[in-house]
């Protein structure tokens, strides 16, 4: 009796807490998860960095400009350049230089680096979308689990109440002499079993809700109530767009557009190809052109020597220069190894791209097969639930008339309960697979507020 009272009180307060707060729809849960997911934030930061890298690659086409100032203080014996004799003097030299240089040819390294940065900037958005899609699919799966377990509580509670009502009837029939004491005990055992199933189902529901909070990055201490159903399963089973898309996938074995995962894999393969070209350019000659201006100031600090003024020397010593440099790499083992490593990375990236496309194809086709399978299961289970419900009703009438044993009645009740749970599970999976099929065909999960 204490257990019964505990279940009633717990169910009463749980229902009050759920009714007292706003239910979260699937769209709201996905939006919250995408906003607070660390994976999405990380990809957003990476996107900003790719934009900065692209701007830097543009600046690499401009000449490099440098300025240099140096000072030299020397003393002791040295050779006088005028008399070619040794003397002992102390001097101070001050040098100034301003120069610029531009690369005329580097094997396409700068150009390919620019193309690589431009590609990375474009693919960064696909990486963000991939993170958002992955999070949406994860939350959708956890949301369906949470809805399923919550709905299962209602079925388990209904079964428990029916068993209690049956116990009351059996006790009255026992008092009238129409049922034996073992029948009453067997029904009491059935009630205890249903109490356990109800408690177990509540535990599974709490666990599923906690998994949903974890996937959403939702505060564990805050309450979260999910809506009754993510979609109308009857509408999902007859969506013309999904049915057409499914037939197209089944006939031709392909989907209409590449999803972000494949787009990102293709961008990585192209990035690796550009990197190979950049490393290969290091093995080619490099031609650069430069020029600038330079001047200096000199002063002999030995006693009795008078130097010209700083301004006069700065102007008189001013000179210009221009140069051209051709650098030819003859042997550099590390450069050859980096080029070889880059080519290997490119070949591996091509394999990853092929694998990503294959995986997308397999996942899409599997979603279509599951979608058709669960749609047929829902139709069949609806008929089975109707039949099992009628069979249980007739068995209850026979039991009241003394024509059926408690065990047989319990068997029909368990069969009806299992059919209802299977129907609920198939409905939830149909709703999930309908959205996945829509995602593989249109790129949208079809989530609406």
Predicted stretch roles:
Residues 7-15:
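Bacterial N-terminal signal peptides
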Residues 20-66, 70, 76, 220, ...:
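Bacterial Sec-pathway N-terminal export signals of envelope proteins
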Residues 21-142, 287, 291, 334-335, ...:
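Short flexible linkers and secondary-structure junctions
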Residues 41-45, 58, 90, 104-132, ...:
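Sec/SRP-type N-terminal targeting helices
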Residues 68-102, 230-242, 277, 290-328, ...:
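Small/polar, glycine/serine/threonine/aspartate-rich low-complexity segments that form flexible
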Residues 134-256, 370, 374, 416:
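Periplasmic alpha-helical coiled-coil/stalk elements that build and connect Gram-negative outer-membrane
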Residues 174-178, 399-403, 440:
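A short glycine-centered flexible hinge/capping loop motif at secondary-structure junctions
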Residues 210, 215-222, 422-449:
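Acidic, low-complexity, intrinsically disordered peripheral segments
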């Amino acid at each position: 009796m204490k257990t019964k009272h505990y279940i009633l009180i717990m169910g009463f307060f749980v229902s009050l807490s759920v009714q007292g707060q706003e239910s979260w729809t699937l769209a709201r849960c996905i939006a919250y998860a995408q906003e607070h997911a660390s994976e999405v934030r990380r990809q957003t930061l990476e996107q900003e960095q790719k934009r900065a890298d692209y701007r830097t690659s543009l600046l690499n086409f401009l000449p490099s400009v440098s300025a240099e100032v140096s000072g030299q203080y020397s003393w002791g014996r040295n050779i006088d350049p005028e008399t070619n004799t040794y003397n002992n003097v102390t001097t101070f030299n001050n040098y100034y230089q301003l120069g610029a240089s531009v690369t005329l040819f580097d094997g396409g390294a700068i150009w390919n680096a620019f193309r690589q940065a431009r590609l990375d900037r474009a693919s960064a958005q696909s990486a963000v979308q991939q993170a958002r899609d992955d999070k949406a699919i994860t939350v959708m799966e956890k949301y369906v689990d949470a809805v399923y377990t919550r709905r299962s509580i209602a079925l388990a509670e209904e079964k428990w109440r029916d068993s209690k009502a049956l116990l009351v009837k059996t006790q009255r029939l026992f008092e009238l002499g129409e049922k034996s004491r073992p029948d009453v005990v067997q029904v009491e055992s059935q009630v205890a079993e249903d109490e356990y199933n109800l408690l177990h189902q509540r535990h599974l529901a709490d666990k599923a809700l906690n998994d949903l909070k974890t996937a959403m990055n939702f505060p564990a201490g805050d309450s979260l109530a999910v809506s009754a159903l993510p979609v109308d399963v009857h509408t999902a089973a007859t969506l013309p767009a999904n049915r057409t898309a499914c037939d197209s996938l089944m006939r031709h074995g392909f989907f209409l557009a590449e999803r972000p995962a494949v787009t990102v894999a293709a961008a990585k393969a192209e990035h690796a190809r550009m990197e190979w070209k950049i490393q290969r350019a290091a093995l080619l000659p490099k031609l650069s052109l430069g020029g600038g201006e330079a001047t200096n100031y000199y002063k002999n600090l030995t006693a009795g020597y008078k130097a010209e003024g700083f301004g006069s020397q700065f102007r008189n010593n001013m000179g210009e220069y221009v140069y051209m440099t051709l650098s030819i790499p003859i042997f550099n083992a590390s450069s050859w190894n980096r080029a070889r490593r880059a080519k290997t990375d490119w070949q591996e990236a091509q394999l990853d791209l092929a694998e990503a496309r294959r995986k997308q194809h397999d996942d899409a086709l599997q979603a279509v097969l599951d979608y058709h399978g669960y749609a047929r299961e829902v139709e069949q289970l609806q008929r089975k639930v109707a039949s099992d419900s009628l069979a249980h009703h007739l068995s209850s009438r026979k039991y009241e008339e003394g024509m059926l044993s408690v065990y047989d009645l319990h068997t029909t009740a368990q069969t009806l309960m299992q059919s209802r749970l299977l129907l609920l599970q198939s409905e939830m999976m149909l709703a999930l697979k309908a959205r996945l099929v829509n995602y593989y065909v249109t790129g949208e999960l079809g989530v609406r507020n």
